[in-house]
């Protein structure tokens, strides 16, 4: 194996841009920014979305577009003899 061809694998702090929560993880990503985390200074990477702010993980996920499309379809074709699963 060749020496010194792999990037440095080090501890990095990822910061959620919308909530400000910090996550410590190992990564090869580089950054000039630094931040303090639990008394130590680490390179900082700002993220737009993390598990702290993503709707899937926060439980604030909305299905309005899909639900609206299904309701619109059911209303449009209600008179054609199609039955809903609830009617069976």
Swiss-Prot record:
GO biological process, one term: translation
Entry GO MF terms: structural constituent of ribosome
Keyword Magnesium found: no
Pfam families: Ribosomal_L31 (PF01197)
CC terms in the record's Gene Ontology section: ribonucleoprotein complex; ribosome
Classification via InterPro entries: Ribosomal_bL28/bL31-like_sf, Ribosomal_bL31, Ribosomal_bL31_B, Ribosomal_bL31_sf
Gene3D superfamilies xref list: Ribosomal protein L31 (4.10.830.30)
Keywords: Ribonucleoprotein, Ribosomal protein
Keyword Ribosomal protein among UniProt keywords: yes
Quaternary structure (record): Part of the 50S ribosomal subunit.
HAMAP family cross-referenced by the UniProt entry: Ribosomal_bL31_2
Similarity comment text for this entry: Belongs to the bacterial ribosomal protein bL31 family. Type B subfamily.
NCBIfam families tied to this protein: L31, PRK01678.1
Name recorded for this polypeptide: Large ribosomal subunit protein bL31B
Species of provenance: Leuconostoc mesenteroides subsp. mesenteroides (strain ATCC 8293 / DSM 20343 / BCRC 11652 / CCM 1803 / JCM 6124 / NCDO 523 / NBRC 100496 / NCIMB 8023 / NCTC 12954 / NRRL B-1118 / 37Y)
Upper taxonomic lineage: Bacteria, Bacillati, Bacillota, Bacilli, Lactobacillales
